[in-house]
């Protein structure tokens, strides 16, 4: 997806870009400082998120463990883009000399990190959606259904899956089937999460009225669950906005690579990378502002 070798050999130090030199449209150059600034902000924010959850025992619950997984994925995509930007700059200015083979391997590592982050983000968001669904609709059985051990197994499974999928997607990126598989995974998970949230928000009020009369039921717990669902719906919305251009780029790359309009859209790949990094910056802000609401 990204072409580190192309950027370095052409002396383009305005950030990583896609290897699409045939586009008749001018590429939108973005300065190195923009990538590095966003990467640093995202890294610090997500470290604070993970640290806050680790230190606050009240947050040692499945939902926040899944949020930690999402924060790690956000850190990974920011680190990969920042690291690649620095590498491009060093190679272009002759501060770092590598063989073509080494550059290609390094490029694959960066791209794999982005794919791993993507799959981990999608799976973590889905895990949180399922957790909120169980919390709201199976409140009395939640502690039994979502145990700490089960939560840990889910997170381990998520990262095992994404660690395996990421390199495969990059090694076989020229295969149309691989790109279609990645896009299909994205759309399927979005559809599933949207269905869960739609069902939650449409049925939650009626469900609450039915169980509110049960002995020992506390309305505050339900409000907290709904608050968590709203927060994660916001995270999902930001994820869609920030990652959708990247996936549209992939779709156009295999469906109409020679079309003028498609080529023009794909020539702005740097901007789509910036949007992806913005997602990593915005997520911790959502955690912070939503946690302050009563």
From Swiss-Prot:
Topology in membrane: Multi-pass membrane protein
Entry-linked Pfam families: 7tm_1
SUPFAM superfamilies given in the database record: Family A G protein-coupled receptor-like (SSF81321)
InterPro entries for this protein: GPCR_Rhodpsn, GPCR_Rhodpsn_7TM, MC3-5R, Melancort_rcpt_5, Melcrt_ACTH_rcpt
GO CC list: cytoplasm; plasma membrane
Keyword Metal-binding among UniProt keywords: no
One of the GO biological process terms: adenylate cyclase-activating G protein-coupled receptor signaling pathway
Ranges per topology, Cytoplasmic: 54-65, 131-147, 204-231, 290-294
Subcellular location: Cell membrane
Record function comment: Receptor for MSH (alpha, beta and gamma) and ACTH. The activity of this receptor is mediated by G proteins which activate adenylate cyclase. This receptor is a possible mediator of the immunomodulation properties of melanocortins.
Keyword list, A-Z: Cell membrane, G-protein coupled receptor, Glycoprotein, Membrane, Receptor, Transducer, Transmembrane, Transmembrane helix
Molecular function via GO: melanocortin receptor activity
Organism: Sus scrofa (Pig)
Gene: MC5R
Similarity section: Belongs to the G-protein coupled receptor 1 family.
Annotated TM spans: 30-53, 66-89, 107-130, 148-171, 179-203, 232-257, 266-289
Glycosylation sites: 7, 12, 20
Side Extracellular, residues: 1-29, 90-106, 172-178, 258-265
Protein name per Swiss-Prot or TrEMBL: Melanocortin receptor 5
């Amino acid at each position: 997806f990204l072409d580190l070798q192309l950027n370095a050999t052409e002396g383009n130090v305005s950030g990583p870009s896609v290897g699409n030199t045939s586009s008749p449209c001018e590429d939108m150059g973005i300065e190195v400082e923009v990538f590095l600034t966003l990467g640093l902000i995202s890294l610090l924010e997500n470290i604070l998120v993970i640290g806050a959850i680790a230190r606050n025992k009240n947050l040692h619950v499945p939902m926040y463990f899944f949020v930690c997984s999402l924060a790690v994925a956000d850190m990974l995509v920011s680190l990969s883009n920042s690291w690649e930007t620095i590498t491009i700059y060093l190679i272009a200015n002759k501060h770092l000399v590598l063989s073509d083979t080494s550059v290609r391997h390094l490029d694959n590592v960066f791209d794999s990190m982005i794919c791993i982050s993507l799959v981990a983000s999608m799976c973590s968001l889905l895990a949180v959606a399922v957790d909120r669904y169980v919390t709201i609709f199976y409140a009395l059985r939640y502690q039994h259904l979502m145990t700490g051990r089960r939560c840990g197994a889910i997170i381990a499974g998520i990262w095992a899956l994404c660690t395996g999928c990421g390199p495969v997607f990059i090694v076989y990126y020229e295969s149309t089937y691989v790109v279609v598989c990645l896009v299909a995974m994205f759309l399927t998970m979005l559809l599933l999460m949207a269905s869960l949230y739609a069902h939650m928000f449409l049925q939650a009020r009626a469900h609450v009225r039915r169980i509110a009369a049960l002995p020992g039921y506390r309305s505050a717990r339900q409000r907290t669950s709904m608050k968590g669902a709203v927060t994660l719906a916001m995270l999902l919305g930001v994820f869609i906005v920030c990652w959708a251009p990247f996936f549209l780029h992939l779709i156009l790359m295999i469906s109409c690579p020679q079309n003028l309009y498609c080529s023009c859209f794909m020539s702005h790949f740097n901007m789509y990378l910036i949007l992806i990094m913005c997602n990593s910056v915005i997520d911790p802000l959502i955690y912070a502002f939503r946690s302050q609401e009563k």
